Curated annotation (Swiss-Prot):
Sequence segments annotated as region (Disordered): 1-42
EC number: 3.6.4.12
Keywords, alphabetical: Acetylation, ATP-binding, DNA damage, DNA repair, DNA-binding, Helicase, Hydrolase, Metal-binding, Nucleotide-binding, Nucleus, Phosphoprotein, Zinc
One GO term (biological process): double-strand break repair
Occurrences of domain Helicase C-terminal (ranges): 500-653
Source organism: Mus musculus
Record protein name field: DNA repair and recombination protein RAD54-like
Tissue: Hardly detectable in most tissues. Dramatically increased in thymus, spleen and testis.
Length: 747
């Protein structure tokens, strides 16, 4: 018997197919082995008992995806590319990518041949021999402003960026790296400085960043504004660090982190900090080097002896940019402090500057100066301008005439009411403040007298408490007030300026959709504005020193919205005169003048700015014949001085001697305008303008070249015409001028 058929080999034999389960197993011959098909090999073999019928194979099973294919498909759905965990990040912070250093010719970061490219530096041309001789990896490259910025820069801004870059890279004055950006308000100084910072942080002729870090120091009210401007123009390409408040330890920790950043990939290369915070934490910032410092509202550094100046001067950086729309505010020595801060030594010491420049120039500008004094002063002025112009750039606001609607400025002289006149004369008789000024001294009591008279010009309600308390100068004046007078109620008819303001607001509200900004130096005057608005049912917004920085931004944004129902925006010039953009309004009233023309200029520039679409009207209210006109005349003195040194206007007329400016405590009841009287105007006969202003004169011209009106004829503002009709005795004289002729297509 064959071994394969033996009972011991039973388990190894495969059963044959049977017709039914009842059939007995019969041993048969073993079929020869055949090669298994591919389909059969895929079925896993298993042991089957010969006494059981094998399971039928499922040959019609539907096709299914392989598990590995399915997993790969799910992964492709869920997978996301790597994203840098920085908000709004859109590109590399540095100019170099990771990897090996590429050999070959250096290339500029941006194409200098692109249409509209702003090229700040162009390498000197090389001969073919020099190109072969020099190392290609050391050749200087073009410095080209990032196209995202150069495309939005206006022509004067492109010129300004190039000037700034040449100054801070020591190409204008060898060995000096500072400059003053003295453009007037509204010309885009912030954008120009952001462009400068971004360019220095990204590139240089050496194909690497010029600086690693930059610090922007500004008033606390502008810290957020700077942060927003950087975000606006650069998007997520850079992450600035803004600090204005917090605990000392927290601020120190942030500043230490900022100063410890190194290399080409600094995460936060721009620090924005307020003057106050900088002064308190300068010890941390002095520990390292900073590539560039920018000081906004730089006229704060006019005194080289104050702590802020000394703190900034101790910072380890030679590249210094000072932004100030009004570089001269009080005297030339303050101007010297600003120039000395950015470029130490180019004007000598303070003593040398005063002797060589300041005294001869001031002497020549006096109305009583001799011809020799004038000639010597002009020579020193030319010498000073020649030195300073290498590090100072200034463009006046007449450039804006291409981009902004017409601005009409009006200086409105208002007659005091009988109550104001009597209180004014009583105070001068009883306080006798002029006696303290005869020796040229300014005592505490004389300063107090100035404040009292300024408040009286605004409204008698502001000095009512002094009358009740019978303070110096106001003894026995309580009986002058009308019977039953209530200081808590607003009575516009008791103040000449308040009466005119009431008419201006009423006419504007009834005849147009214009909004109005009211500006005053005193919060007490703002209180009167509030009372007047409540009585007249005007919706209003108020911004003063008590409002937080965060809330200011929201209030301004709401007021500027076309859908906002607010009609009046009340502004304290001390708290919010700088940096605010109030283009939602196109009429602004300066209710009282400041000694410093820069403060008034800043406040008046809130509405005539980029984005304004309407004709702007500026009203400067002055009480005729009073201390307010003397203050206004002093402003003209400072502005003429600034114009001579900064604007290079040689033909600015000097109408006021220094002796005349000391006549503060006088009252000329009969004068329609003390300022006009002192001009000795040749274009007016019997207080009526006979000859028009010279061609080309505008708002920046001397006051003698404005229009002079003693009635409503000739006024360019319908609202003021209507107000003059309504208050024929309240308005005595108006100076008015327009910024430029209206251009076609600009409304």
């Amino acid at each position: 018997m064959r071994r394969s058929l033996a009972p011991s080999q039973l388990a190894r034999r495969k059963p044959e197919d049977r017709s039914s389960d009842d059939e007995d197993w019969q041993p048969g011959t073993v079929t020869p082995k055949k090669r298994k098909s591919s389909s059969e090999t895929q079925v896993q073999e298993c042991f089957l008992s010969p006494f059981r019928k094998p399971l039928t194979q499922l040959l019609n099973r539907p096709p299914c995806l392989d598990s590995s294919q399915h997993e790969a498909f799910i992964r492709s759905i869920l997978s996301k590319p790597f994203k840098v965990p920085i908000p709004n990040y859109q590109g590399p912070l540095g100019s170099r990518a990771l990897g090996l250093k590429r050999a070959g010719v250096r290339r500029a970061l941006h194409d200098p041949l692109e249409e509209g490219a702003l090229v700040l530096y162009e390498p000197p041309p090389l001969s073919a021999h020099d190109q072969l001789k020099l190392d290609k990896e050391k050749l200087p490259v073009h410095v080209v402003v990032d196209p995202i910025l150069s495309k939005v820069l206006r022509p004067h801004q492109r010129e300004g960026v190039k000037f700034l870059w040449e100054c801070v890279t020591s190409r204008r004055i060898p060995g000096s790296h500072g400059c003053i950006m003295a453009d007037e308000m509204g010309l885009g100084k912030t954008l120009q400085c952001i462009t400068l910072m971004w360019t220095l942080l990204r590139q240089s002729p050496e194909c690497k960043p010029e600086i690693e870090k930059a610090v922007v120091v500004s008033p606390s009210s502008l810290v957020k504004n700077w942060y927003n401007e950087v975000e606006k123009w650069l998007g997520g390409r850079i992450q600035p660090l803004a600090i204005d408040g917090g605990s000392k330890d927290e601020i120190d920790r942030k500043l230490e982190g900022f100063m410890n950043q190194r290399g080409a990939r600094v995460p936060s290369p721009i620090l924005i900090i307020s003057y106050e915070t900088f002064r308190l934490h300068v010890g941390v910032l002095k520990k390292g080097n900073v590539g560039l410092v920018i000081c906004d509202e730089g006229h704060r550094l006019k005194n080289s002896e104050n702590q802020t100046y000394q703190a900034l001067d101790s910072l380890n950086t030679s590249r210094r940019v000072l932004i100030s729309g009004t570089p001269i505010q009080n005297d030339l020595l303050e101007y010297f402090s600003l120039v000395h801060f950015v470029n130490s030594g180019i004007l000598g010491t303070a003593h040398e500057f005063k002797k060589h420049f300041e005294l001869p120039i001031l002497k020549s500008r006096d109305a009583a100066a001799s011809e020799a004094d004038r000639q010597r002063g002009e020579e020193r002025l030319r010498e000073l301008i020649g030195i300073v112009n290498r590090c100072l750039i200034r463009r006046t606001s007449d450039i804006l005439s291409k981009y902004l609607p017409v601005k009409i400025e009006q200086v409105v002289c208002c007659r005091l009411t009988p109550l104001q006149t009597e209180l004014y004369k009583r105070f001068l008789r009883q306080a006798k403040p002029e006696e303290e000024l005869r020796e040229g001294k300014m005592s505490v009591s004389s300063l107090s007298s100035i404040t009292s008279l300024k408040k009286l010009c605004n409204h008698p309600a502001l000095i009512y408490d002094k009358c009740v308390a019978e303070e110096d100068g106001f003894e026995g004046t309580l009986g002058i007030f009308p019977p039953g007078y209530n200081s808590k109620a607003v009575e516009p008819q008791l103040s000449g300026k308040m009466l005119v303001l009431d008419y201006i607001l009423a006419v504007t509200r009834s005849r147009s959709s214009d909004k109005v900004v009211l500006v005053s130096n005193y919060t007490q005057t703002l209180d009167l504005f509030e009372k007047l608005c409540r009585v007249r049912r005007y919706l209003y917004v108020r911004l003063d020193g008590t409002m937080s920085i965060k809330k200011r931004a929201k209030v301004v944004e709401r007021f500027n919205s076309p859908s906002s129902p607010d009609f009046v925006f009340m502004l304290s010039s001390k708290a919010g005169g700088c940096g605010l953009n109030l283009i939602g309004a196109n009429r602004l009233v300066m209710f009282d003048p400041d000694w410093n023309p820069a403060n008034d200029e800043q406040a008046m520039a809130r509405v005539w700015r980029d984005g304004q679409k309407k004709i702007c009207y500026i009203y400067r209210l002055l009480s005729a014949g009073t201390i307010e006109e003397k203050i206004f005349q002093r402003q003209s003195h400072k502005k003429a001085l600034s114009s001579c040194v900064v604007d290079e206007e040689q033909d600015v007329e000097r109408h006021f001697s220094l002796g005349e400016l000391k006549e503060l405590f006088t009252l000329d009841e009969a004068s329609l305008s003390d300022t006009h009287d002192r001009l000795h105007c040749r274009r007016c006969v019997n207080n009526r303008q006979v000859w028009p202003p010279p061609d080309g004169s505008d708002c920046t011209s001397d006051l003698a070249q404005w229009n002079h009106s003693t009635d409503k004829r000739g006024l360019q503002d319908e609202v003021l015409q209507a107000a003059w009709d309504a208050s024929s005795t309240a308005i005595t004289f108006v100076f008015h001028q327009r910024s430029h002729e209206e251009q076609r297509g600009l409304h």
